[in-house]
């Protein structure tokens, strides 16, 4: 783990970031009718294993099964009627796709969803369930973006970016507001990182409320571009990714990178075996089924890297963002059986 970054609450509002505490509070008011205020769970058994008090913000119980509905609904309900009339388009491997489809359905407008051919079946089914118009792409981010651009040009639909967008970031940040409203004494939050929309929103909100709070990212070893970016001081992309955490394969955007660079204190990298072990622990001790991307925060809290760091010694009450629960049960049981 590297040195702490970031300058706290004032910096979170004054350095020209895409979002701030004000846009996040506006998002909270805007999306309140359309999202769940998800529960915060705890387990004395898990606390004993980790050696700290953990508070799990369970976005696996969110509408569409993940935190993504926060950013999607904020983006879609922020559109004026003329902008919304031609619908919205996005590209996503799963959770954001379903969230956009659902938010568009709630707004009564069409949603064009570009999905890579390797997306998990359970997540594709969610998009269909919410009435999204699916357009397939190849698996690369370049293909996804190219197809989304073509659909946008053909339909006039507004792009709802999965992470690199002010309204998306602001919507995701509302999860941090809820967590700290319920457990204000939290001193560290561990957040999954991929494109950076969630952790950017969490960091901007949390550090505005409590400048001394620590924000840690959790990232899979097979898709550790954020850790490499943090070390290099610039955005690093990878030629390919290989991880069970299918929701954590995107790379940082130009709007999320400055927040990650400045306000994320450290990035903990864990392997897929650790993620599966954390999924099992969530199921056995929290009685909650979570997807790999949602379990990675617990995996990070259990890691030797964290326990050997100053962050572990300086933390007592740790928030864990359980980002989603859209897991293919067949994959879940196969993974748990192998462990």
Curated annotation (Swiss-Prot):
Keywords from the named record: Allosteric enzyme, ATP-binding, Calcium, Isomerase, Lyase, Magnesium, Manganese, Metal-binding, Nucleotide-binding, Pyridoxal phosphate, S-nitrosylation
Stated name of the protein: Serine racemase
SUPFAM superfamilies: Tryptophan synthase beta subunit-like PLP-dependent enzymes
Modified residues (S-nitrosocysteine): 122
Phylogenetic classification of the source organism: Eukaryota, Viridiplantae, Streptophyta, Embryophyta, Tracheophyta
Catalytic function, reaction form: L-serine = D-serine; L-serine = pyruvate + NH4(+); D-serine = pyruvate + NH4(+)
Quaternary structure note: Homodimer.
GO biological process, alphabetically ordered: D-serine biosynthetic process; D-serine metabolic process; L-serine metabolic process
UniProt binding sites for Mn(2+): 219, 223, 225
pH dependence: Optimum pH is 9.5 for racemization and 9.0 for hydration.
Residues the record lists as binding Mg(2+) 2: 219, 223, 225
Binding positions (pyridoxal 5'-phosphate): 95, 195-197, 323
Cofactor(s) the record lists: Mg(2+); Mn(2+); Ca(2+); pyridoxal 5'-phosphate
């Amino acid at each position: 783990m590297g040195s702490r970054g970031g300058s706290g609450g004032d910096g979170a509002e004054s350095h020209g970031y895409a979002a701030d505490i004000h846009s996040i509070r506006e998002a909270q008011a805007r999306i309140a009718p359309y999202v769940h205020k998800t529960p915060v769970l705890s387990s004395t058994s898990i606390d004993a294993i980790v050696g700290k008090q953990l508070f799990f913000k369970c976005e696996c119980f969110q509408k569409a099964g993940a935190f993504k509905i926060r950013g999607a609904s904020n983006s879609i309900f922020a559109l004026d009627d003329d902008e919304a009339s031609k619908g919205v388009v996005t590209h996503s491997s799963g959770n954001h796709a379903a969230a956009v489809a659902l938010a568009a359905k709630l707004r009564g407008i069409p949603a064009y969803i570009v999905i890579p051919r390797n997306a998990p079946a359970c997540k594709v089914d969610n998009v269909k369930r919410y009435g999204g118009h699916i357009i397939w792409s190849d698996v690369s981010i370049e293909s996804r973006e190219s197809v989304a651009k073509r659909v946008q040009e053909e339909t006039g639909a507004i792009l709802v970016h999965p992470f690199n967008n002010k309204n998306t970031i602001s919507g995701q940040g509302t999860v941090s507001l809820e967590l700290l409203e319920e457990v204000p004494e939290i001193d560290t939050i561990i957040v999954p990182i991929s494109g950076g929309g969630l952790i950017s929103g969490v960091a901007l909100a949390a550090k505005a409320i409590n400048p001394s709070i620590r924000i840690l990212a959790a990232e899979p070893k097979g898709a550790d571009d954020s850790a490499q970016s943090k070390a290099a001081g610039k955005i690093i992309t990878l030629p390919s990714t290989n991880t069970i955490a299918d929701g954590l394969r995107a790379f940082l955007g130009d709007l999320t990178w400055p927040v990650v660079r400045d306000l994320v204190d450290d990035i903990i990298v864990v392997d897929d075996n650790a993620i599966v072990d954390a999924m099992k622990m969530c199921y056995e001790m929290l009685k909650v089924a979570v997807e790999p991307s949602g379990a990675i925060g617990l995996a990070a809290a259990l890691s030797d890297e964290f326990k050997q760091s100053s962050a572990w010694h300086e933390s007592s009450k740790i928030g864990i963002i359980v980002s989603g629960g859209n897991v293919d049960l067949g994959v879940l049981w196969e993974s748990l059986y192998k462990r």
